[in-house]
Amino acid sequence: MDSTRPSRPKVSIADRFGSPPNRDNRRMPSPPKVLFGFHAVGVRLKTSPKSVFEVFFDASRRDARMRQFTDRAREAGVRLIESDGLRLAKMCGSHGHQGVVARVDEQAQVKSLDELLEQLEAAGTAQPLLLVLDGVTDPHNLGACLRVADGAGAQAVIAPKDHAADINATVAKVASGAAETVPYFMVTNLARTLNELKERNIRCIGTSDDAVKTIYDADLTGPVALVLGAEGEGMRQLTRKTCDELVSIPMRGAVESLNVSVASGVCLYEALRQRR
């Protein structure tokens, strides 16, 4: 496999939000070398076909969906290799591959959170929306959060390096392509990162079951980072203290909390509603 990586232009933009220190400790984790499933591979083919080295497909599948997929890959100039379900499962470590596995370049078009914010400022994005996850260690939950973040138009998802799931093939599969479209940044010190976001005039709004104000009473317009903890545990104490304000999601039934991906959807789409 060719190890050469395509060169990418460096962004040099005056940071009107301010320039926080310790830029080097906030890098995106490397995306997976293997993607599987129609959605994950299809999004990569659509957004960055040159980064797809080859696609392996189950030759026993002759349905319309597989034909359409392989036709799209051929049109993109991607090498297609016939395989079978068992071999594909061994390649990606999952039987949920749907007959499609791709080997892709490890690309990260936006290399740091600071670079992303600079690009948003340069593009005139007045209301950046970020999702911060504290303690979400389950890959399925992370994948679902990335998917809802993409749907709501969030510009990035942020998590602590020492207390979060990393991007892997399972995350990419559950995210249904959103792992390819939503930047995911793992930071060394989450509380410090939240403080730096606040220095950039991005309000950090955390969720807590005991907060009096509800998400529907909060002002989610303007630059906002929504901070959520894992189901049951919630945010860590320091993360909680660092937030500008805390809000709750109203619960009318017997259960006390929502799954973090569902809670993320409630909060992100309320922000989207307020920004219409």
Name every feature range the model reports, one short phrase each.
Residues R74, L194-K198, L272:
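Surface-exposed amphipathic alpha-helices with a cationic face
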